[in-house]
Amino acid sequence: MKALHFGAGNIGRGFIGKLLADAGAQLTFADVNQPLLDELNKRKRYQVNVVGEQARVEEVKNVSAVNSGSPEVVALIAEADIVTTAVGPQILARIAATVAQGLITRHQQGNTRPLNIIACENMVRGTSQLKQHVFAALSEDEQIWVEQHVGFVDSAVDRIVPPSEAGSTDILAVTVETFSEWIVDGTQFKGQPPEIVGMELTDNLMAFVERKLFTLNTGHAITAYLGQLAGHQTIRDAILDPAVRQTVKGAMEESGAVLIKRYAFDPQKHAAYINKILSRFENPYLHDDVERVGRQPLRKLSAGDRLIKPLLGTLEYQLPHDSLVTGIAAAMSYRSEQDPQAQELVTLLAQLGPKAALAQISGLPADSEVVEQAVSVYNAMQQKLAH
């Protein structure tokens, strides 16, 4: 199995790339970080530190790397059996032209073996969005050919992979938690789905996408935002603070009530899933900074993302949402010198005031009760900070 993976960052190396390599794939990473690519090509292997109760070091072997901007990538797509990505939602649109060129070359070479493309991003149906960008760069004839021979498979991914420790001298080493979940839409494959241990097929992907978004992502973000407000440095410190934990757990229970209503999830199993996630946030071996987890607040406060989407569900089913609203107010309070979106958020709040700013960012009506509620919690948070 020939595999090409876009994104040789921590998630690429520590999660998706690792599962592909473990499955015996001939794996090539595509990235723009030249020193990283050079090192991968020199060593052809790297170490993954899996941390939890039982820490272990696993080696990933027989890998190579190419620059995403090079003609080699096009040639690899023309030959590959599987193409995966972990580049972040913003970059996904940027690699579409390269993917399209690879598919055109594949067509020209008469390669009719099935190819499956799986975007492994923190977004809802990311591969379908990638497909739209790719199709925009194809002629009608090419689109027809691609529809016949190429599967665009949506997925939900879940593994916490913090940045390397400061002082870690190995550019390739990566640390990951023990838990991992990669769920793919089994209905979207062309040909037989590849056998990859750790990749689960489902015919009801949206239930899993929203379960992860509404629980892990919602909880992680709110832990970061409340943690920063309370002066904590790491996610672990924040979630061990009883006041933070109470709101985070409350928010996950509120979003969970939406999932139980929408997808008929088993309430007890979902409660266990929430507890599992809380214990993952407590992992003493993952040093995950609240500032890092909170970054890109504008994206995280947008209509389809981890804070507003579950809130809209509570409104749809007339369910409680006080903790989610507190989380939204905390996100509005996020500050970071390193994050351009945090700077933009501050500007919007100053120019428009909190009410109009939240309405503009989230798409919620400015005169709605929830916006009023979020703004009043936000104002109280700001007053507390001022004292």
From Swiss-Prot:
PROSITE patterns: MANNITOL_DHGENASE. Keywords: NAD, Oxidoreductase. It holds the Pfam family Mannitol_dh. Its EC number is 1.1.1.17. The keyword Lipid biosynthesis does not apply. One of its GO terms (cellular component) is cytosol. Signal peptide: none annotated. It comes from the Bacteria. The keyword Oxidoreductase applies. It catalyses: D-mannitol 1-phosphate + NAD(+) = beta-D-fructose 6-phosphate + NADH + H(+). NAD(+) binds at residues 3-14. InterPro entries: 6-PGluconate_DH-like_C_sf, 6PGD_dom2, Mannitol_1_phos_5_DH, Mannitol_DH, Mannitol_DH_C, Mannitol_DH_CS, Mannitol_DH_N, NAD(P)-bd_dom_sf. One of its GO terms (molecular function) is mannitol-1-phosphate 5-dehydrogenase activity. GO terms for biological process: mannitol catabolic process. Belongs to the mannitol dehydrogenase family. NCBIfam families: PRK02318.1-2, PRK02318.1-3, PRK02318.2-2, PRK02318.2-5. This is Mannitol-1-phosphate 5-dehydrogenase. It comes from Yersinia pestis. The gene is mtlD.
